[in-house]
Amino acid sequence: MGKNKALLSLPGNQAVTFIEHLVSLLEECCSETLIVARDQAHAQDYVFPGVRVTIDETPGIGPLMGLYSGLSAIHTTRAFVVAVDLPCVQRALLSFLLSQPLPTDTLLVPLVHNIPQVLLAIYPRSILPIVREQLLQGRHDLRCLLKVAPVQFVEEVQLLQNDPQLCSFINVNTPEEWRGLF
């Protein structure tokens, strides 16, 4: 995309960035808010009162390293993970996912069009050894965890009750996708 997506403005509110919106939303629902930054330069852009920032243990490896770094840094038993390029996460969906009963070692992953939405999911801290093993095997994509860790999927019909347009899963990766939000 050529620029830090976290600092792009939200549709309908040019004064609020993706990261500001997500931090505000997560602070309402979660006991701890942690941002995982790619590197020190990005971390400097993510200073918010009461929010900790950690840096990828090995920059440039991808989302799986981000998850590993985040799970290593949290003080809670699980993390609600939201990618910064999902700027339209709905509060009702977030609350619904967080309210789901879940065994302590199980991932909670929404399904949209039968595709696992690993960038908006709940990950238990207890899977750190599994994540580490996947990294050591050269894997970088969060989807690899779906084959090696216990997973509870949330069906689309349940998601639609809390996010009728499934806006929460709109991923912004290109300037065209960002402009399409407006």
Regions found by a protein language model. Give the residues of each.
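Nucleotide and nucleotide-moiety/phosphate-recognizing core
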Residues: 1-168, 179-182
